[in-house]
């Protein structure tokens, strides 16, 4: 589970911590010496400041906290045989690709229907990566890296704003580029009101929550330069990635 908010607080820890323990125990029992752990940028927390791999993690959600603990569980496994075991921790931004049914699919659908507007601002920075680039990096790192602990932010560098992402989406797919920006105060009041009504009538409105609205307006300002500095290259630019994703996707599912 990774949708936040969306689950009970304890569910994030049950899933991510027990999952990490199970993986490490399996690796011990089967003499596995390489683990690639897909963490998240959530351990950095929701802050506007740029974050590098050296930044102090300050998670602001149960998901981010549980992922950070899971990283430490994997580090403990590696430390048992530091000269033999290889741990690669990846902190990807929003991952998009065929059948992901997530942020990019929802963005396309909203833009295609003319319902998308910029939430609060246009310059929100959003860390993203194409699934094919992420998979390629995993294979390359597994082959290249030596025993030890290796941490990488897996995001496009330089980072893109939500406006740049929307303009690229419009250019590649032919949907209309959004022009309207709705003030943050209006969105917060609207989300709070709808959630309040939902509680009164016992109904949940999927995707509408004050915390989620706030999340939309905060940058995920993640620095991906370490990848480049260590010789790794992404095969797709943002435009190429969206174009490839669009061609791979079932257009009926996107509408």
Which positions does each model-derived feature cover?
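Active-site Tyr-X1-5-Lys
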Residues: 58-88
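Conserved C-terminal active-site "lid" loop/helix of NAD(P)H-dependent oxidoreductases
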Residues: 131, 167, 190-232
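Conserved Rossmann-fold NAD(P)-dependent oxidoreductase catalytic core, especially the SDR/UDP-sugar
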Residues: 21-62, 88
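Mid/C-terminal beta-alpha module of Rossmann-like enzyme folds, strongest
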Residues: 141-207, 243-246, 252-255
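Glycine-rich Rossmann NAD(P)(H)-binding loop
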Residues: 97, 119-124, 152-159, 170-173, ...
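Amphipathic terminal alpha-helices
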Residues: 222-229, 233-255
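Substrate-positioning beta->alpha
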Residues: 100-106, 120-143, 149-153
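NAD(P)H-binding glycine-rich loop region in Rossmannoid oxidoreductase-like domains
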Residues: 1-18, 22, 44
């Amino acid at each position: 589970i990774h949708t936040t908010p969306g689950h009970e607080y304890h569910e994030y820890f049950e899933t991510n911590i027990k999952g990490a323990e199970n993986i490490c125990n399996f690796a011990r029992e089967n003499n596995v010496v390489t683990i690639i752990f897909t963490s998240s940028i959530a351990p950095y927390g929701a802050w506007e400041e740029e974050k590098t791999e050296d930044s102090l993690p300050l998670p602001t959600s149960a998901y981010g906290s549980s992922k950070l603990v899971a990283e430490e569980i994997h580090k403990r496994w590696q430390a048992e045989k530091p000269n033999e075991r290889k741990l690669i921790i990846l902190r990807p931004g929003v991952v998009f690709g065929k059948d992901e049914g997530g942020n990019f699919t929802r963005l396309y659908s909203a833009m295609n229907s003319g319902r998308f507007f910029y939430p609060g601002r246009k310059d929100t920075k959003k860390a993203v990566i194409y699934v094919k680039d992420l998979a390629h990096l995993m294979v390359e790192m597994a082959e290249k890296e030596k025993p030890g602990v290796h941490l990488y932010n897996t995001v496009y560098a330089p980072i893109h704003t939500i406006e740049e992402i929307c303009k690229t989406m419009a250019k590649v797919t032919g949907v209309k580029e959004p022009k309207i920006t709705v003030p943050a105060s209006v969105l917060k009041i609207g989300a709070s009101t709808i959630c309040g009504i939902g509680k009164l009538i016992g109904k949940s409105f999927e995707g509408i929550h004050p915390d989620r609205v706030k999340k939309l307006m905060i940058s995920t300002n993640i620095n991906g330069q370490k990848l480049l500095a260590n010789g790794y290259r992404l095969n797709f630019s943002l435009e190429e990635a969206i174009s490839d994703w669009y061609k791979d996707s079932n257009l009926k599912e996107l509408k």
